[in-house]
Amino acid sequence: MNVTAVRPPRPDELILALETSCDDTCAAVVDGSGAIRSNVISSQGVHDRFGGVVPEIASREHLRVINTAVDDALSRAAATLDEIGLVAVTQGPGLVGALLVGLATAKALAAARGLPLAAVDHLQGHVAANYLAPERLEPPFLCLIASGGHTLLGSVGDHEDFTVLGRTVDDAAGEAFDKGARLLGLGYPGGAALERLAAEGDPGSFAFPGGGGRKGNASAFSRGLDFSFAGLKTALLYKVRDLGADEVTRRRSDLAAAYQAAIADALAMRVQRALLQTGADRLALGGGVAANGAVRERLRQLGVPVHVPPRELCTDNAAMIASAARFGPRLAYPGYLDIDAYATGERRP
């Protein structure tokens, strides 16, 4: 595949990175030392009225704005394409149509400028966001990635060594937040709205599987390191139906607080077990769910240092893709032309 190098870039080398795995069109410029020169995120509000991301619409929106995102990233970095030394792009996992927009753009830029290209795994990007934070973390550590599309627990041995210990068997944690918010009438995306509502409620008011209420009980899926949130979502659905519209309206904040605590406890159970099994003494977080304050606090109760990137680096962004590219292989033309996208649940080719 014509690998040109597997080495950290020079500190002054600029990396232009693209991320289009879902519904955010992202472009960033990061230098070889890990300093972020720019980090542009263009979110697609068009999906709100559908209650979720529509893949075809996401792809079309990426096509519409990706060139503008690249121009903005270069402008904010006070850089030109002539100064870029490496192009990086998310290869997967994600929505294939959306990923292909980023891949095609990255390949075209690299080919036109005679630059190498780094194809990055999206989940490795979330891990690598921890290498960009003001208090940069270095391996080894345990890492929990929790977002709308992924929930994964892994051991990070070095910058390119990520061993999966557990993953979701159904819904992701972020998806559970969004679906719970929809059941409580908070709209989409609902994770942040549910967190705000939960701050006004009592997490011990209701019992949910695996949850944090004082009436809660350990769920059947609490054994092992894999995650499951489908049962929790169904439990909230039945509770909402049983209470009726008026009672749900009156106790909506309590429902939100108990549901959020159950998600946080489900994550903490697996992390605690993984800490014991691996002997890890540090935990890093990645993904949009890492921005949730209740989740962060619950994980801090486990007694090990918890490293969390800034909120803008927790959600999907291209700076984290550039960060991962600093430590991975770069491909020369024409080898990278054969790179294809891979969907969520597929193995990397």
Regions found by a protein language model. Name each.
Residues 119-120, 299-321:
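Conserved phosphate-binding/catalytic loops in two-lobed NTP-binding clefts
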Residues 96-98, 106, 111-137, 155-156:
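Active-site neighborhood for divalent-cation/phosphate handling
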Residues 310-347:
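Glycine-rich phosphate-binding/hydrolytic loop that grips phosphoryl groups
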